[in-house]
Amino acid sequence: MATMLINHMLFLTSLLIVVFPVANAIPARDIDKLCKETTDVPFCLKYLGTDPRIPAARDLTDVLLIAITQSKMQVDDATTHIDRVRRKFNGPHGRRRIEVCKTNYGIASARFHTAWELGLQKSFWDVEKLARIGTNAVIDCENVWRRDGPIQTSPLTFYNMNVFKLSGIILLIFNKLVT
């Protein structure tokens, strides 16, 4: 009898662990609907809609945390890219611009990390503020390539635009959470 009870409890616990997150997951149609409210639907569907963590997301707070994580991943990838391309920019303007981007991506990384931590605490206004600061640092990295000297093509435009678009998604989710 005791063995049957233990087996039954293990089965129910396993069932709860496996089924509970899925049963309470945010429906995929809600993610599609959210993405349709963004300025770049295919981008949103690519980065949020296909994220393997989305099926386990219970609510918009979890989706917000995933979007912040996606931003942090883009920032980290850009930082790695900076290290790879830095030697291609040996002129004074290129070196200065790469250093501005390296510094700004350091700021963005720290801000998105803290935003994620505050998102866990549901401190949404602080999340919004930090996501803006991180995004503005990335935007400045894009803009520095057009300031103070000859215009150059930024080697980080891909990452800069991804962070900018993810920021729009973060702000959209933020607005839904606070209104």
Swiss-Prot record:
Subcellular localization(s) per the UniProt record: Secreted, Extracellular space, Apoplast
A UniProt-annotated Pfam family: PMEI
Domain of life: Eukaryota
CDD domains according to UniProt: PMEI (cd15797)
GO biological process: regulation of seed germination
Disulfide bonds: C35-C44, C101-C141
Molecular function via GO: pectinesterase inhibitor activity
Signal peptide: 1-25
One GO CC term on file: apoplast
Keywords annotated in UniProt: Apoplast, Disulfide bond, Secreted, Signal
Tissues in which the UniProt entry reports expression: Expressed in seeds, buds, and mature flowers.
Primary location group: secreted
Family to which this protein belongs: Belongs to the PMEI family.
The protein's role, per its UniProt record: Pectin methylesterase (PME) inhibitor that targets PME from seeds and modulates PME activity and pectin methylesterification during seed germination.
Name of the protein in question: Pectinesterase inhibitor 5
Designated gene of the protein: PMEI5
